[in-house]
Every structure is written in structure tokens, then in C-alpha cells.
């Protein structure tokens, strides 16, 4: 009986140690809200987001949106730079935009990879990084 009690106590301690030793992970979803590059792709309905389009989308606007996205995602990482293990995104035009996001100085240390679905309607592009 005494051995069983000791065994149960040790098992409970081992279980508790394993549970408390686990590191929480961050998983994030972010709607990028019409994040387009500036290149007109005839395969994609992106005419609105080109330098000639109604939104006059250009490299200055692109760089500003890229910087804002970098800031938001880096702020989620926090001061301890605990980067999210997965970031789901929507409304992204193509892989090139995602590559620019993960190459920014604050996001590059996260060592992200990309899984992306190209949609003919660019607004519906989704990805995980």
C-alpha cells in the first residue's frame, strides 16, 4: 500500500512537471485587407491596385502597408520576441507580397515559410506563414 502511494505521488509529480514545463505557442490570424503588389497581373483581377488604377497603388503605398504589417506582427511577438508559430492571413494578392512580409527586418528572425493559395480574385488569396 505504501509503495502504491509513493508511486502514485511520484507519477503525479512527473505529470505536473510535464504540464507546467510546456511553453504556450502563439497562433495568429490577420486579415491583410487588400494587400496587393504594384504589378498589374493579367491573370488576376487587380486593376484597382495598380499605379494606373483608381486607388493609384504605388511603391510608396506598398512600402507603408508593408511597414504597418511588420509592426503589427512584431508587436504580437512582444518584447521577448516570442514569434507566433503560425500566422494565417487573408486578402493577400500573391506569394511575392508574403515573401516581402517575412523578409522585413523585424519578421526575418521568425524564420517563416509560406503556404499560399493563389486565387484569380486576388482579394480571396489566403496563406499560412
Residue ranges of each PLM-predicted region?
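Bacterial Sec-dependent N-terminal signal peptides
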Residues: 1-23
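N-terminal, active-site-proximal structural segment of metallo-dependent hydrolase catalytic domains
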Residues: 20-105, 111, 115-126
Amino acid at each position: 500500500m505504501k509503495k502504491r502511494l509513493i508511486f502514485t505521488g511520484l507519477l503525479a509529480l512527473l505529470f505536473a512537471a510535464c504540464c507546467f514545463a510546456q511553453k504556450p505557442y502563439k497562433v495568429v490570424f490577420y486579415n491583410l485587407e487588400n494587400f496587393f503588389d504594384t504589378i498589374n497581373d493579367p491573370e488576376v483581377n487587380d486593376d484597382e491596385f495598380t499605379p494606373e488604377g483608381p486607388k493609384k497603388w504605388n511603391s510608396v503605398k506598398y512600402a507603408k502597408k508593408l511597414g504597418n504589417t511588420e509592426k503589427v506582427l512584431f508587436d504580437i511577438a512582444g518584447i521577448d520576441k516570442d514569434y507566433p508559430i503560425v500566422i494565417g492571413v487573408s486578402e493577400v494578392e500573391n506569394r511575392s507580397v508574403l515573401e516581402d512580409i517575412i523578409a522585413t527586418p523585424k519578421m526575418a528572425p521568425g524564420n517563416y515559410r509560406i503556404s499560399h493559395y493563389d486565387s484569380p480574385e486576388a482579394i480571396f488569396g489566403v496563406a499560412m506563414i
